Amino acid sequence: MILANAFCLFFFLDETLRSLASPSSPQGPELHGWRPPVDCVRANELCAAESNCSSRYRTLRQCLAGRDRNTMLANKECQAALEVLQESPLYDCRCKRGMKKELQCLQIYWSIHLGLTEGEEFYEASPYEPVTARLSDIFRLASIFSGTGADPAVSTKSNHCLDAAKACNLNDNCKKLRSSYISICNREISPTERCNRRKCHKALRQFFDRVPSEYTYRMLFCSCQDQACAERRRQTILPSCSYEDKEKPNCLDLRSLCRTDHLCRSRLADFHANCRASYQTLTSCPTDNYQACLGSYAGMIGFDITPNYVDSSPTGIVVSPWCSCRGSGNMEEECEKFLKDFTENPCLRNAIQAFGNGTDVNLSPKSPPFQATQAPRVDKTPSLPDDLSDSTSLGTSVISTCTSVQDQGLKANNSKELSMCFTELTTNIIPGSKRVIKPNSGPRRTRPSAALTAASFLMLKLAL
């Protein structure tokens, strides 16, 4: 009997020590409820296949039809429907820009997310999947397709915008869609109506959605050294039809008009998500991704909120929708904030300059900040030359910590190959979570202490 009790006690202690030594469960609060998003069309199909989800989805759509959030929250059926859908793929679904059923996907997304917040939000979450491509990918593809001129800044004397138009004409798809929107946007309807803006916008959307960015970016963000080049860049979207109007509407009215259309609303939300100025990042962009910002900017062309260069200055880059803040009344501060997201946006300005210069940011995951009493550990790294010009030259708050000359034949403007980076840390970031895990570190194990081992031995001895 004593031996049996001793064996049970020893087994219990052994299991306790094993549990202490085992890796922690991955289902912590950081990962609870996370699931990989699917596109909203597929999520709708999955929901329709489940009677509980489909019935709750119909209920929620009826609840949101009145657009009265307080009434919806006071209704128990509406609350129950929302709780069920928050656990379904519909709640986290996203869309892809240019996908076959993009409009249907966006309609499903906004049918759930519209009305869930009180009032109108200044910044709305983007319904699109995050962009993972980089500008360096665009440069590499441009070098493959064009053969020469992969770097937009190879020659300071050439008209890069003219070169971009020539490159487009060498591609059948680009040439066809460009000729189409030029013809439509230049077609005068009557002496009082210079063009059909609706058809012009549609043709522009087709061009920027269907032509690879290796061509469209070169036309839209080409670098210029003189006014003639800058004017050609400004004329890329045929602004007399697609952009300008007799009078400038109020910017908040223009935003409200845009938000009545699911596509326009989505493109504006995506622009804010990827281009909103952030002073916590190296590039002033939310995710340090110039490509994401430029893609979001180009995605707004062909809608009521269409932005463009405000003048033909080759030295300053200022873009804006065709609107002003006159007549804003007590909403003037909000209007100015909205407008400055275009006219005084360091993220967007840096992204346009980076493409024009043929450079991209080579980011390694951020290392812990250095102590004031310690110098950074950089071995024999050449100091940056005073004349080095990069995409951050106009950014007041951007300091490049790690810049590198592009591969695939790209060269820096001063023809000196330079690479200065701090030690790279390879990390993985779990989607939907801010938790950073080093892949080589593995799960951390808790070693059983010597005290626990001694205690188990003592208790076993007493039992015997």
Swiss-Prot record:
**Localisation:** Cell membrane
Polar residues compositional bias: what residue ranges?
360-374
Residue ranges for the region (Disordered) are 360-392
The record's annotation in Pfam families points to: GDNF
Annotated keywords? Cell membrane, Disulfide bond, Glycoprotein, GPI-anchor, Lipoprotein, Membrane, Receptor, Signal
Membrane topology term reads: Lipid-anchor; GPI-anchor
GO biological process entries? glial cell-derived neurotrophic factor receptor signaling pathway; nervous system development
Output compositional bias ranges, type Low complexity.
381-392
- Positions of glycan attachment: N52, N357, N413
Q: Which SMART domains match?
A: GDNF
Q: Which residues are modified by lipidation (GPI-anchor amidated asparagine)?
A: N440
**Record-level GO cellular component terms:** external side of plasma membrane; receptor complex
One GO MF annotation is: heparan sulfate binding
The record's section on InterPro entries has: GDNF/GAS1 (IPR016017), GDNF_alpha (IPR037193), GDNF_rcpt (IPR003438), GDNF_rcpt_a2 (IPR003504), Glial_neurotroph_fac_rcpt_a1/2 (IPR017372)
* Bridged cysteine pairs (disulfide): C40-C93, C47-C53, C63-C78, C95-C105, C161-C222, C168-C174, C185-C200, C195-C241, C224-C229, C251-C323, C258-C264, C275-C293, C285-C347, C325-C335
Assembly, in brief, is: Interacts with NRTN ligand and RET: forms a 2:2:2 ternary complex composed of NRTN ligand, GFRA2 and RET receptor. Also forms a 4:4:4 tetrameric complex composed of 4 copies of NRTN ligand, GFRA2 and RET receptor, which prevents endocytosis of RET. Interacts with SORL1.
Give the protein family. Belongs to the GDNFR family.
Q: Which protein, by its recorded name, is this?
A: GDNF family receptor alpha-2
**Annotated gene:** GFRA2
